[in-house]
Amino acid sequence: MILEEIVNFKKEEVRKKKELKPYNELLNVNAVYRGDFKNSLNKGKVAIIGEIKRASPSKGIIREEFDLVEIAKTYEKAEVDAISVLTEKRFFKGEGGYIPQVKKLTTKPVLRKDFVIDEYQIYESKFLGADAVLLIVAILEDKLKGFCDIAKQIGLDVLVEVHEEEELETALKAGCDIIGINNRDLKTFKVDIKTTERLIKNIPKDKIVVSESGIKTPEDVLYLSSLGVKAVLIGESFMKMDEGRIKEFVKKVRGG
């Protein structure tokens, strides 16, 4: 299973990071502009989170000519509502250092997207300058509530990711207010956008629902919005578009 492989790699990676930069160093956070991730997704119209994603285990390299500065500026110009930055190194070719670079280039809230297995990574996310962090129920299970509490205590919003009914139940019991429905099964990496349709029926209306993966067209976004989705996260599709097409996509979703 790909997820198991990623988690095993993360365990070793975090162990090494703790040796290089102990907890106490992560607490020395420089003052950076803080974006309000939660409110950026709750403005009435469906919000768009543009993702910076160089590669994936299923597709390999997605964007050959990867220019972080150019992509961040494109998202800023296209007026997406928030930016997701994949920082996983081995399988997605990301870097933690992308976060502070992107923060310098945008006023949009920044989500750190990685595979969090240890509370160390939550403090690290804050240290890097992220405004929000992704927590995956399939990885954390009963650790979820404790990790959510830590994130909130240090001023980070949390996007809690689910794919199955059981995971959704765990997220709701933990009191999570931003629920990300991943249309991709992390065990097989197969994508089905109908996953959102299936799960959203069981989510209270006061929660902010984000649909992730497999979103390719403005029509997909409008369909998801009609189900009650408040925001969509788009990575691979945007990574294959130039600035003009991304702007056009966002404009069409907003009725322009």
From Swiss-Prot:
Assigned EC number: 4.1.1.48
One matching Pfam family: IGPS
Pathway(s): Amino-acid biosynthesis; L-tryptophan biosynthesis; L-tryptophan from chorismate: step 4/5
Reaction(s) catalysed (UniProt annotation): 1-(2-carboxyphenylamino)-1-deoxy-D-ribulose 5-phosphate + H(+) = (1S,2R)-1-C-(indol-3-yl)glycerol 3-phosphate + CO2 + H2O
Domain of life: Bacteria
GO biological process: L-tryptophan biosynthetic process
Single GO molecular function: phosphoribosylanthranilate isomerase activity
Keywords: Amino-acid biosynthesis, Aromatic amino acid biosynthesis, Decarboxylase, Lyase, Tryptophan biosynthesis
InterPro entries: Aldolase_TIM (IPR013785), Indole-3-glycerol_P_synth (IPR045186), Indole-3-glycerol_P_synth_dom (IPR013798), Indole-3-GlycerolPSynthase_CS (IPR001468), RibuloseP-bd_barrel (IPR011060)
PANTHER family according to UniProt: INDOLE-3-GLYCEROL-PHOSPHATE SYNTHASE (PTHR22854:SF2), TRYPTOPHAN BIOSYNTHESIS PROTEIN (PTHR22854)
NCBIfam families: PRK00278.2-4
Family, as annotated: Belongs to the TrpC family.
Protein name: Indole-3-glycerol phosphate synthase
Organism: Caldanaerobacter subterraneus subsp. tengcongensis (strain DSM 15242 / JCM 11007 / NBRC 100824 / MB4) (Thermoanaerobacter tengcongensis)
